[in-house]
Amino acid sequence: CMLYAQDKNTSSFLFDDFQEAVVYFKNGSQFREKMNYNILANKFYFVDRVDNKVKALSNPQDIQVIKFSNRVFYTEGNNGIEILPTNPVLYVQYKGNMRKEASKGAFGQPTETTSVKTYGGTYAGRGERYDFDPEKLILGSRYNIYWIEQKGKKKPFKNFNQFLKL
């Protein structure tokens, strides 16, 4: 059971540990569990109270919003996107590049010089599909994608200079 993200620098989870959250479904029902968001898998995970195992939240299309204390997320496809309480409304998608766990080198010691590939999401640079085992891949780097809502439309930006041009 992975209740806590291991190392802040390499953890693929948004939060340091699983947080109390409420999932509000489009049909009006609610679901309360300890949850976290995996920025590499682009999925919300929860700790099942019955067997204490970490499981992926299914049917994201049926979810209205997910609230972690005062933070609000919605799902777009499998992606979790945070709605920031600003005027105008800002949206943030938390992302990460993954890299394969270091290979074993001489004397069984891990080494990153033997053969390391870096992946952005679950596709390699040439579009080849890479089905990853979460235990074998670690977070390479984190980055965010931002949108601002203007005149009913979401406009993307990646940095402050792009924001100023909107």
Which residues does each PLM region occupy?
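Bacterial Sec-dependent N-terminal signal peptides
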Residues: C1-T10
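N-terminal secretory signal peptides
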Residues: N9-K53
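Aromatic-patch recognition
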Residues: K34-N161
